[in-house]
Every structure is written in C-alpha cells, then in structure tokens.
Amino acid sequence: MRKKKFRNILVVLGGASGERAVSLESGRACVRALKKKGYKVKTFDPKFKNFNLINRLKIDVIFNALHGKDGEDGVAQSYFENLNIPYTHSGVISSHNAMNKIISKEIFNKNKILTPSYFSLQKKDFGINIVKKLIKRKKINFPVVIKPVNEGSSLGVKIVKNLKDLIKNTKVQFK
C-alpha cells in the first residue's frame, strides 16, 4: 500500500487558552518552515472559528500547534478524530492523561517512575486545616511548588516558602 502524501496542511494555532501567544508564535514558525519545504499551508484559529469549519477546507493533515487547555488535553484531538482527518499530536486519551498532572502522577507511580511527593487540593474542600493535615500526612516540607492541574507550560507555577504563602497563592489559583 502506498503512503498518502500530505501536501495540503492545516496549522491549527492560537486558541483561547492562557497559552494563546505561545501557540501563535510556534504555529507561525511551523507555517514558515512548512512553506519553505514546499507544502501548501492554511491556518485555522479556533478562538474565532468553529472546528467544524475545518471540514470545508481541502486539507490532507492537521498540524496541531495549539498549546494548553483545549489544545493539548484531548479536546482538539477529539474534534480532529471526529472529522476523520489525520493530525500531529498524541491521541485523545494520551493527551488528556498527559495534560492532567494528577493522572500523570498516578501513571508514573503505577509504573514505578519516581516523582516528587505531591498532594492535590480541590476548591470544594480547600481550607487551612485541610492543607496543614495534608502537609503533615504527606511529610512535605517547604518550599513547595504549586501548579494548576490542567495548565501547560509554566502558567500558574509558584514556589512558596511557607504555609501562609501556600494558602494565599492557592486561593489565587482557585479564582
């Protein structure tokens, strides 16, 4: 069986996540590189257009240059699969699992891959006493790193040096 040649490429970039600027920059770099190699390239920004409009375009493959929420968490990938168009990136489940820090940690632990100690906080049960108990039970010492469970890159990452700063920064994360 002959391999299909992907000549018409759609670069999906931008989006509405907190990483929009990074996605636009990397997406534009991909467009330049692909055009330089002789590919026909179109761009698509889902912040301004519905994914279903992709079906109207004459493309062979989607180059996913989205970052963060909806771009790396399985959402865009599920749209691409529903449109039955090949795309770059991991599949829906792999993307979802990799983007979610808690699921990733569980997979790493199950496979005996060492990672730092951690605990997760949910908005519904957040309170200073719960945080103190978790820190004591998990034997976690300061400083600690906090990060939203579903953000990419360094968005929301804070290094906190004491309980007061942990409470303050966690409240900010939950807003």
Regions found by a protein language model. Give the residues of each.
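ATP-binding N-terminal substructure of ATP-dependent carboxylate-amine bond-forming enzymes
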Residues: M1-I93, N97-M99, I103, K110, ...
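Short Gly/Pro-enriched turn/cap motifs at secondary-structure boundaries
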Residues: K69, P148-V149
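Short, basic/glycine-rich phosphate-binding loops at helix/coil junctions
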Residues: K112-T115, V149
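Conserved ATP-binding module of the ATP-grasp superfamily
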Residues: T115, K139, P143, K158-K175
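Conserved S-adenosyl-L-methionine
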Residues: Y118-S120
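Acidic/histidine-enriched active-site and ligand-binding environments that engage anionic O-linkages
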Residues: K132-I146
